[in-house]
């Protein structure tokens, strides 16, 4: 896990997106909810992970080199375990969720900022996970591309043309 570079240059995805990649990541989904406190999403995500045979995840913060939490999804539900992030005030740092095989990754600078899921779709399990996720939870590259010249788009209002271009330059 140490070979993953975690630098969040700016807190807003629209300025410069978080860089935490291993170069194998080739599909991306963006989200605007708290990765550690959106219990409705976490409940859903826990089920999708298990259905796609992901049985463990590690949770990192930007202040520690080792995981602050390792969750065996067969034995523990993600929600009560991830609440420890709030109990121990880790939500003041960046959050990264990643499986031991590094086939996908989710990162968010602060819980109020936009975050990104990254997938290595050459990995069959990761491709299956990407396909299984309900895209209504996320903003896709396609949606960003459509919003680039549409000033009435909520994404254009959120990021502006320069912000969307920065995201597309880093992720498309």
Residue ranges and their predicted role:
Residues 1-172:
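Structured alpha/beta or helical-core interaction and ligand-binding surfaces enriched in interleaved
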């Amino acid at each position: 896990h140490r070979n993953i570079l975690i630098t969040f240059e700016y807190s807003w995805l629209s300025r410069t997106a978080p860089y935490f990649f291993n170069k194998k990541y080739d599909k991306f989904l963006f989200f605007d909810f708290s990765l550690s406190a959106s219990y409705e999403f976490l409940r859903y995500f826990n089920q999708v992970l298990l259905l796609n045979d992901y049985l463990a995840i590690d949770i990192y913060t930007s202040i520690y080199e080792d995981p602050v939490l390792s969750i065996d999804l067969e034995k523990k539900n993600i929600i009560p375990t991830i609440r420890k992030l709030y109990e121990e005030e880790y939500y003041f740092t960046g959050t990264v969720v990643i499986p031991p095989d590094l086939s996908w990754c989710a990162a968010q600078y602060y819980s109020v900022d936009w975050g990104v899921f990254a997938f290595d779709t050459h990995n069959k399990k990761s491709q299956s996970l990407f396909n299984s996720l309900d895209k209504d939870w996320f903003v896709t590259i396609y949606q960003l591309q459509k919003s680039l010249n549409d000033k009435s788009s909520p994404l254009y209002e959120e990021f502006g043309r320069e912000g969307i271009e920065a995201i597309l330059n880093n992720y498309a």
